[in-house]
Amino acid sequence: MTTSELPEHLAKHEVRYADHRQVERDRLTPMMQHYAEVKDQHLQQILLYRMGDFFECFFQDAIVVARELELVLTSKEAGKEVGRVPMAGIPYHALDRYASQLVEKGYAIAICDQVETAAQAQGPLVRREITRIITPGTILEEGMLQARRNNFLAAVVIAGEHWGLAYADSSTGDYWTSQSTGLEGLTQELYRLQPSEVLFPSAAPDLAGLLRPGQSKPQQIPDCLPDSFCYALRSPMPFELHEARQRLLEHFQLRSLEGCGCEQLPLAIRAAGGLLDYLGETQRESLAPLQKPRTYSLSEFLILDQQTRRNLEITQTQRDGSFHGSLLWALDRTMTSMGGRLLRRWLLQPLLNPEAIRNRQAAIQELCQDGRLRQDLRSLLQKIYDLERLSGRAGAGTANARDLLALAESLLRLPELAQLLSRAQSPLLAQLQQVPPELEQLGDRLQQHLVESPPLQLTEGGLIRSGVAIALDELRQQVESDRQWIASLEASERTATGINSLKVGYSKTFGYFISLSRSKADQVPDHYIRRQTLTNEERFITPDLKERESRILNAQTDLNQLEYDLFVGLRSEVSHHVETIRAIATAVAAADVLAALAEVAVYQNYCCPEIRDDRQLAIQDGRHPVVEQALPSGFYVPNSCGLGSDRGPDLIVLTGPNASGKSCYLRQVGLIQLLAQIGSFVPAKNAQVGICDRIFTRVGAVDDLATGQSTFMVEMDETANILNHATARSLVLLDEIGRGTATFDGLSIAWAVAEYLAREIQARTIFATHYHELNELSGLLKNVANFQVTVKELPDRIVFLHQVQPGGADRSYGIEAARLAGLPSEVIDRAREVMSRIEKHSRIAVGLRRGNGSQRRTQASPQQIDATIATEQLGLFSGPSH
């Protein structure tokens, strides 16, 4: 940043130096010299420098902060020869709010805080140190986190087509690692995680710092890493195998990584070690305790790519990205933040293991049948705070007294929870039948030591109850005795002086004083010492008052320090139990999710699906879980679906009018499959669900302006991905393939895609289309069936029945939809005229009905097809008749 980049209002007032590196250091004031020295070490972060009650920024950081936070940009004298330099500041008590805004915009922040008071300072400057570096992926502060979302930091190592991935949420302690082959899998895993920050090793020395979302990526970052994330480019050294392994072994005090499951996964180890190094560098003394890394494989879970997650609107809507209207919105009846985060993870990682699915079903079934147990459980869970993050802040040394009280209250609920679930039969609920007794003891100890309503600040006293420590009680008694002496001083001095308006007061600047009106000042005794003269007031002190003040202030300082030390001891005690607390928190979160899913199942009338080992998908009277909640009760029209059985089709060609509900039906089937594989009940009268390895969707498309791809090219890319990766155990949901190009081209592509899916892949597929010619496929392939969304035709309009029934539709009623949308009547009339001519002359399917490998058909010659096409084009657009 150059001087010319200074804002105009600063440039006009002789404010110079838009960058601290432009200034000769020996010309700066001592404080500014220290600021510049610290800034040299943190060029890639915004430096927030504590000065009294404010965190200040200077030079280039001040300009950035003022711009991004819309704060007033002012200036400060930096030295006689330097003049004024840019300055912006935020109140120290509002740090979380402003830091959160900067982090959301992709900035990293270095906190340079005062580590001693002015009274403790040995020299002219109060000692300041970097106490914390806040980056998007390393946030611990409660006010900067979303309660029901994880805040993941990820690290990636790539070697050819092989990759290693580690990710952690330092606020909850989650720490996972994986290794696989195929960069597309890495891309999709990052999309699933939505990490706030991604670490990537780079040897380029000039690429340090954060790349914010949307910034152009340097060549060192491969194309498989999406532009939508924030990247921190790191030195390769911590990502070297030996360095990374050693760091993991030392940090977790292990002899090998066998127990973590990654001993034979070198890329996973490198990613995990590089991530741990970054956390140590950024969190310094407040490094949050992490669980030992756990290893997982992509093959353990149903694969949902980014396209499918978006089309099925699992966590946010496709239209505006809002939570309201998503599947998560429809299901989230969890009572705790931990449960909310876990439900999100379950929805994004459906299971493939039938036994694990059935275990969840068993717990939900028990909670559905025992309504009293379910309601009591949910009421109790509502009183439990976020055990994961509370214990994490305690372990990191950042928890305040209110955090520990919330933790204590939650820990003391656990025995009650164990008693409530003592009669539970399902293994997932039985996990909470035994609670470690030391957690109840810890909760008792915290409640007995901390006052009921402690302040947020830890260094100003008022934290610890009386009776906890003898020394504390003695100090309090001394302070109280001296304060009572001062309180009685006003009455005794009024009597002694005869001045009834005399008052005893206190100010931070001058301490305790005796106040008199100036008209009475000549009546004061000789031992009064004048301290301050104001317009209408004189302030005095006495030797006794000064002595008492000194005793009070010294005792209060000692008292505050002792309370703080006792609190730190309590917090340290909690940190020794973090692993145990988090283990029980995992079980509590699971119980919360299971109870929430049971609540939805009961009130929305869901059924328990039969999980099968074959490919069958049989849904009787299925419903869309989100749409039915948005409609009045009973308004949603249920529909059935059968795919993958010996008697049923593998591919359904679904036809019907515009706006009749085809896309809703596709999503409904996909969501029921997904819900079944997270162990949930499903919105249907009955359901048999075979395990699915992957759900593919291609529903709607828009131009990708960022890459210059048209709607049709986006559609073809997505379709190619499906055809190249689908298996017989996949579920494929396609809507209007081929619509983005010319009619003949689109129909040809749609036919070929449907034929390939049914004949070659044999994936369970629903193929929604307006190409009614595709109904011919059912006569050529035994595993294809035609279904339609029905309408009722009235003389002047049509009524959408939203019922899916066997058979193919021969009309789309697009002109009727256009009329309902309000197109001018002359346009509608002309469209009907053109349509009648097309229907009269069209033989588009002549080539498709003949051939296609069928022994019952003969192949049409090119000349026949050309003649047909020419006939169709004659007279269609010759103008309206009169």
Swiss-Prot record:
InterPro entries: DNA_mismatch_repair_MutS, DNA_mismatch_repair_MutS-lik_N, DNA_mismatch_repair_MutS/MSH, DNA_mismatch_repair_MutS_C, DNA_mismatch_repair_MutS_clamp, DNA_mismatch_repair_MutS_core, DNA_mismatch_repair_MutS_N, DNA_mismatch_repair_MutS_sf
Gene Ontology MF terms: ATP binding; ATP-dependent DNA damage sensor activity; damaged DNA binding; mismatched DNA binding
Annotated coiled-coil segments of the chain: none
Keywords, in A-Z order: ATP-binding, DNA damage, DNA repair, DNA-binding, Nucleotide-binding
Record: residues binding ATP: G656, P657, N658, A659, S660, G661, K662, S663
Function: This protein is involved in the repair of mismatches in DNA. It is possible that it carries out the mismatch recognition step. This protein has a weak ATPase activity.
Name of the protein this chain belongs to: DNA mismatch repair protein MutS
